[in-house]
From Swiss-Prot:
Enzyme's top EC category: oxidoreductase
Function in brief: Catalyzes the NADPH-dependent rearrangement and reduction of 1-deoxy-D-xylulose-5-phosphate (DXP) to 2-C-methyl-D-erythritol 4-phosphate (MEP).
Alphabetically ordered keywords of this record: Isoprene biosynthesis, Manganese, Metal-binding, NADP, Oxidoreductase
Entry EC no(s): 1.1.1.267
HAMAP family assigned to the protein according to its UniProt record, in alphabetical order: DXP_reductoisom
Biological process (GO), any one: isopentenyl diphosphate biosynthetic process, methylerythritol 4-phosphate pathway involved in terpenoid biosynthetic process
Designated name of the protein: 1-deoxy-D-xylulose 5-phosphate reductoisomerase
Cited Pfam families: DXP_redisom_C, DXP_reductoisom, DXPR_C
Residues annotated to bind NADPH: 12-15, 38-40, 126, 128, 217
Pathway: Isoprenoid biosynthesis; isopentenyl diphosphate biosynthesis via DXP pathway; isopentenyl diphosphate from 1-deoxy-D-xylulose 5-phosphate: step 1/6
Length: 397
């Protein structure tokens, strides 16, 4: 069996590291062909020494120069590239078999689209591709003959709970024809699901990044605390599974053992369960339609005391409601919301605004952008840039 060449867009981040762990557990099946990062020289250097990729690329030109010098000094033959164009070329490299698209934020958009346009098998962990590009992205997957597999634990759970006909028609699955009545998206509710609302004004960045169940980066941890993460996943799920608002349900499940579910018209509910470890969905997408060892502890049913479910409270999670409404408003609104949220979360982490200001800035940014029909990627980038400037101005006020 020939090894699969994997390109990891975002290898220095949380998902990237988990992907390398799966590769390490399956050295006979996978090879880390190219590793891509932002400007984290130290982590990339360590990864190059351990995994010996053909290529390593950093978005930051100066960081790439330092990395190149370090690798030469250690006699590591990995070729170092720099900048967005080089990253996009690696995402479409003819020798690449699978592309793990896990660069966080709008920065991951163009490299992910490059992989799609090269007809690659894309393991999608970058939320923004669908949140900002939606129909454009799904159409590109179809038109260029790419294969899309969802890595996010919730979407991967839904994917696994759907029939094979739906799995083969991502973005265009006729849910009702396949007997599906609802897609049930579960979320932990974050660290503040029981915190009294009057205490929200004094929530600190340290409290917000301490997620009870999952190990994640700071941005996604704050998004989990505001449930914007679930809002973005709602938008993604609607595009991935071609689901209407009526076919969607969002439930808070504090234990994060059930990762999402699918209701069928005959009364069945199929759920995917497992320990909260991203290596499971990563391994599932890498091996699909087969299975491979992920290095994850098996689920011990005797240790699970209970599984509980709570209806989401939009007073507690205004960002979740905002995301649902933004999808209904159109692509311009989800793009603006996503951009504003990136700026607002960073401002909160930098202690420039309060926890409750995040949702307010997101809403005000959408309200200041004129409704607009997005035709192409340039429109997306234009609205993204506009929204960021508006959000920055609101923060300064």
């Amino acid at each position: 069996m020939q090894k699969q060449n994997i390109v990891i867009l975002g290898s220095t981040g949380s998902i990237g590291k988990s992907t390398l762990s799966v590769i390490e557990n399956n050295p006979q099946k996978y090879h880390a062909f190219a590793l891509v990062g932002g400007k984290n020289v130290e982590t990339m250097f360590e990864q190059c020494i351990k995994f010996r990729p053909h290529f390593a690329a950093l978005d930051d030109v100066n960081a790439a120069k330092i990395l190149r010098e370090k690798l030469i000094a250690h006699h590591i033959p990995t070729e170092v590239l720099a900048g967005q164009r080089a990253i996009c070329e690696l995402a479409a490299h003819p020798d690449a078999d699978q592309i793990m698209a896990s660069i966080v934020g709008a920065a991951g958009l163009l490299p992910t689209l490059s992989a799609v346009k090269a007809g690659k098998r894309v393991l999608l962990a970058n939320k923004e591709s669908l949140v900002t590009c939606g129909q454009l992205f799904i159409d590109a997957v179809k038109n260029y003959g790419a294969k899309l597999l969802p890595v996010d634990s919730e979407h991967n759970a839904i994917f696994q709970s759907l029939p094979p006909e739906a799995q083969e028609k991502i973005g265009f699955c006729p849910l009702s024809e396949l007997g599906v009545s609802k897609i049930i998206l579960t979320g932990s509710g974050g660290p503040f699901r029981y915190t009294p609302l009057e205490q929200f004004a004094s929530i600190t960045p340290e409290q917000a990044v301490a997620h009870p169940n999952w190990s994640m980066g700071k941005k996604i941890s704050v998004d989990s605390a505001t449930m914007m993460n679930k809002g973005l996943e709602y938008i993604e799920a609607r595009w991935l599974f071609n689901a209407s608002a009526e076919e969607m349900e969002v439930i808070i499940h504090p234990q994060s053992i059930i990762h999402s579910m699918v209701r069928y018209v005959d009364g069945s509910v199929i759920a995917q369960m497992g320990n909260p470890d991203m290596r499971t969905p990563i391994a599932e997408t890498m091996a699909y339609p087969h299975r491979t060892f992920a290095g994850v502890e098996p689920l011990d049913f005797f240790k699970i005391k209970e599984l509980t479910f709570i209806e989401p409270d939009f007073n507690r999670y205004p960002n979740l409601k905002l995301a649902i409404d933004a999808f209904a408003a159109g692509q311009y609104a989800t793009t603006a919301m996503n951009a504003a949220n990136e700026i607002a979360v960073q401002a909160f982490l930098d202690r420039q605004i309060s926890f409750m200001d995040i949702a307010k800035i997101n809403l005000k940014t959408i309200e200041k952008i004129s409704p607009y029909t997005i035709q192409n990627i340039d429109d997306v980038l234009e609205i993204d840039a506009q929204a960021r400037e508006i959000a920055k101005t609101l923060i300064r006020e």
